Amino acid sequence: MLKVRKRNGSIVEFNGGKIEEAMEKAFRATGTPVPGEYIKNKMLMNIYALMRTEDNIVEIESIQDAVEQVLSESGYFQVSKAYVLYRNQRKNVREAAASVLDYSKLVNGYLDRLDWRVKENSTVQYTLGGLILSNSGAVTANYWLGEIYDKEVAQLHKNAAIHLHDLSMLAPYCAGWNLKQLICEGIKGVSGRIASSPAKHLSTLCNQMVNFLGIMQNEWAGAQAFSSFDTYLAPFVRTDKLDYKGVKQCVQSFIYGVNTPSRWGCQSPFTNVTLDWTVPEDLKDQKAVVGGVEQDFTYGDCKKEMDMINKAFIEIMTEGDAQGRGFQYPIPTYSITRDFDWEESENNKLLFEMTAKYGTPYFSNYVNSDMKPSDIRSMCCRLRLDLRELKRRNGGFFGAGESTGSIGVVTINLPQLAYLCETEDEFWEKLDHMMDVCAESLHTKRKVVSKLLDAGLYPYTQAYLGSFENHFSTIGLCGGNEMCLNAKWLGMDLTHRESQDFVEKMLNHMRARLSDYQEKYAPELFNLEATPAESTAYRFAKHDKERFPDIKTANEHGTPYYTNSTNLPVGTTGDVFDALDVQDRFQPLYTSGTVFHTFLGEKLPDWKSAAKLVKTITDNYKLPYVSVSPTYSVCPDHGYIAGEHFKCPICQREAEVYSRITGYYRPVKNWNDGKSQEFKDRKVYDTMRSGVLLNRGAAAGAQAVGRPAVQEKEDHSAAAVNASDTAPVKAADGIPTMYVKNHCPKCKGAEQRFKINKVEYKVVNCSEHMDIARELGITQTPTIIDPDGTRYIGEGAAVAWLGAHKDAAVRSR
């Protein structure tokens, strides 16, 4: 039985009478006599022959195309024109109706919580402010899609091939601000608004920062950031001659202030601060500024006061609010440099206690990544002599360096793209086209928001920034793992080497294309982001599963969602080093937001464990940012509880379970259905099994944290390997030899396991000694060979060796 697919996707029985009726209307409209039954039936037979069917289903547009063609070929040209005119009129009516919002559905969908978008953003609670944001956002999104973007961009968004972020706001995305500029100028520059002179006291500055971030958040869609928070505040402590109690009171007012709902949707400003911990080299000799005036001392003279700021900040963040709930904002990012002092100090202990308990901070890896601490302040000062050079947007996952940021983000639905391609060649062709569309849409948005900036729609941004020339156009991606599953030329997830190689190839391909866009749209900047995809991962999968029932998602038996960016499936491994080895191939290739989240089931046992984990990662991996992310719960009566407890284990009252949703902590009950399913599927990392926390007794822990970082050398010299002051592990009959090569993440992971487990071993770098590799027939690294000739090959080599020599390892400890 022939069926018809209507424009809304519904399928109905075919009714030939409707074709006959439509044709008769066209004849009458032109005054042309309706043909007799014989002619009419012959025309209908020709129409049926022209209709394109698939699985006995015909598209409504195919029927109408066939009617037009038959009328014209039968000599009824005026009737055909009338039919085309009528068809276009109906199309215009449909489009006009589609552009008019169903206000009843919109409002009731929010009030009755029927629309999944009620939980689209976990920071927006069910409130009157949330309703107002929902209503205004729907209007603004229609404006972007109907009036600004071209039809292809709008249609690709509607089809979930791409996601245009922040359509609900006629504003740029995220920004990093120059805190020193605020210190020098105060809050002013906008006509008709109250102005404030530069702050002369720490308490005043803290209030100004709260006000400034709140003001700017209402002119931007995303995160607002300050850099060198502790460095710039320290001189105020010195000139005020504040004791610790006074410092803590000021910092407390700042933290509570930025957590007060003051932006659209009854949200707190989405804020990020970067803390230097030690005075940066490029600021050390600069004269400190207080009250807009240079002082007779430098920032480098204020290390003592800087420590007071850091101590106060961490203590308040660790104490949490009155019910033990961790503060959502600001998200702090700490700089881990080569000269970071890992010794047991009061502030180190506090920092890593906060990390172990709440997972609050992010850590910037300035040890092994391609970033430098000064980059956060130098972006706006660089001359772009090479248009193809890709810059990195510094400042943390949700932050940005001083006077830089992003004007917008467009994310590509990789699983849908792969699903619709028959071959790898077709994939590259369609990926290029999709990126072209994204780049053009971002170019359009930049022109729009720049015009609105000049028109005065963002008055404070105009006063403090002036232009968006140092702000990036950001292209993101989602569902790399499911892309590999749906790719007909792969068909395997990211735990397989073939898929990892393909993703690495894709990221490099995308980077090269971004360089092309920087030349084409010069002087605009482009970057590549591992999109957080809080709602996008769910929206993409939900849409795709409805449209393509056999497409593979991250969960085939529950609520569908896609894995964020190019992350491993959330339930893949409990070994943090397995995940790190894979992500170390991908994350350094992004030039915008990306982070490795170390998800833990509950708080780490002590601060030394957290410090050792962070140090191990930054010493041995190139990925730019890392977080330690324990799950915790909050009872209204008993406060903080380690781990996941939806009911308090003491009083059985309902408790809030907190975990990191994409980059920040929110109650799991506020997550959308897709992210809630991801939380259920998530396998947390067992750091004990990974070996990170072995020998964490008081003395051993202090030694592990207090030792300076071992510098990994490209020649992998044996002298740099044995970083142990305890008896090394040996095979029963001697020392094993590990054969590695340059730039091999699996080799690095194998060496790291040996170091942590105190294994004494030799290293041969096959990149420099191919003759030895050929002689021994070594075709894969890492390869570990015992003196008796036993071989352990591939990414599991170190684990296999440790298992085979378990008794020796136990004796050594």
Model-identified regions with their sequence ranges:
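Local sequence-structure signature of Cys/Sec-based thiol-disulfide redox active-site neighborhoods
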Residues: 723-759
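Structural micro-motif
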Residues: 1, 774-785
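Conserved catalytic cores of very large enzyme subunits
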Residues: 92-93, 99-469, 490, 496-650, ...
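Thiol-based oxidoreductase modules, predominantly thioredoxin-like and allied folds used
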Residues: 740, 760-771
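Core structural elements
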Residues: 69-72, 276-277, 462-483
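Charged, amphipathic alpha-helical regulatory modules used
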Residues: 1-105, 467, 652
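Non-catalytic, surface beta->alpha helical segment in thiol-disulfide oxidoreductase systems
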Residues: 787-813
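Long insertion/accessory domains within large nucleic-acid-processing enzymes
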Residues: 646-712
